[in-house]
Amino acid sequence: MPRLPILTYHGVNVAGNDYATNDHVALASDLDTVDRLGWRIVPLPAAIARWLAGDPSWAGGERTLAITFDDGTDFDWRDLPHPAHGTQRSLFNTLADFRNALAGGRAAHATTFVVVSRETREHIDRVGLADRGWWSDTWWRDAVASGYAAVASHSWDHNHDLAEHLMGRPRATGTFRSIDRFELAEDEIARASAHLKRVAPNPGDRLFAYPYGETNDYLVREYFPSEHARIGVDAAFGDGARPMTGEADRWALPRYVCGRDWRSPEGLAALLRDASR
């Protein structure tokens, strides 16, 4: 039975310059681990499309995995001078380094789940990040055009505490479990999907990842099953810390999160060993 581990990194996770404190450092190390252990990286949108079509080889073979990034800060795409920890090699450039390290090249694709609202991103960047304009959407089309990236939805505004004043309808913020009725789901999911398809159309625009990895029964059992065709979303991802299988719930697909589900090269090796059983 095919099993696809989906590994998740956050470009904004830079609290130092070692594996435990920096997702960029962790990704570079993890790519070497993946290669050493004989795993291959497959594009997530293509794997999901094959899975939904009933292709028995949807995972792309044995010992395959997919890579995702969350939030879509510019640390995903651009090398940036972190104010405390120096220049950071972007997540996608780290993938490019891995691809180009061998003369024949190696497959290395990732899907970045982005916060779609520009107003929200600019506000949170200003008051909660570095206030340097490092949460933009100017690179999304370039990422898609590279052939090594997909851009997918991480909701309209992440239902983020710092963006509460920009939200039109009251709800509890800092959690996605509060998105539990149609109007709120339309604001967070349908609006984001429609806008992303306009500004950066690509195979990833049919995928959604829940902010905070949080689902609820309304979204999983009612909203997505009834509205997915209309809003153009084919699958949704949580953070269930197990490999995706053919029997997985289409609206709560699992992912592993760096720093939570593994914290070292040895931890990733153990995770992959368990995932392949």
Task: Describe each region flagged by the PLM.
Residues 11-148, 159, 197-198, 204, ...:
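Active-site beta->alpha N-cap acidic-glycine motif
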Residues 164-179:
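A solvent-exposed, charged loop/short amphipathic helix patch at secondary-structure junctions
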Residues 259-277:
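Low-complexity, Gly/Ser/Thr/Pro-rich intrinsically disordered linker/tail segments
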